[in-house]
Amino acid sequence: PNVKSQLPKPSQVWAEAQGFEAAPLTLLHIANSRGEIAEILVGAPRAGDDPFALGAIASKLPVGSYAFTAVPETPELVALGWCLELYKYDPLRPTKIKAVKLACPKGVNHAEVVVLAEASFGVRDRVNAPANLFGPDELEQAARNVAKAHGARFSVVKGAQLEKQFP
């Protein structure tokens, strides 16, 4: 739907003056009477675009809490994409994730999105880690931590035992 036509007249005038055409993943900040951001219009991705694409706006937004007024076509993927967009890797200077919070769209299992995002972050950390920071011992400890967190049994074959049992 044409969201601009549903906006209050001052917001419509502002959108027009800014030349906002709602191209995919473009943003338009609309201020309230005190000059504070009241809402942000976002150009939705086109049908068939990457289902995670809408999540890419998370890194373009100022710190704050956000919610979609219209439920996205794939709300689960948008919520996960939002989380994945905020990933940063820097083992020497741990960074805090930018506080751009999304209220989970209706019908989305928040806990599931968090588990998937955390799993992705863990894999990405290991892939991005230089070999001198993430060697066999660190890999073993990471695997041990995952096993422990999920109540799984864990064993390691190494050293002479590995030499003897390796195919």
Predicted regions: what is each one?
Residues P1-P167:
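N-terminal hydrophobic/helix-forming segments and targeting peptides
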